[in-house]
């Protein structure tokens, strides 16, 4: 589903998409995404390693072990789509090597959240002022919190309503920017 939607947006063979057979349409073939569910090499996170076109991307989704019972990150659609979008943006910018600095990583996080949340929302389901939460299932009651289903993996849900998400540029920590 994600592959087909992004293909329609232009992430096709020539752009470096992830697929086994490129059907002679450009790019390098034999590079499907290797999705590892319940990967045992970590907890409470997920990631996507993006090599250049022609080599499979590796998506690892871990168990979130702070909620009780544990929750599987691969069952949270926002996490899966978020990680797949890291693969997309990393392939499109520098063929796997373009978003390696702090600013690029920050942009990648934002794009990945945006695509995950927008692909799961129909155009008229909710207004921009609604609350859009990334990682709500996997992080529910994470570390003893009882209301983080409203926040997920971010400090506030995404929204254009300042009473829902009050963050502005003034909230950026200038120490981390130096």
Residues covered by each model-derived region:
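Extracellular zinc-dependent metalloprotease catalytic-domain scaffold
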Residues: 1-178
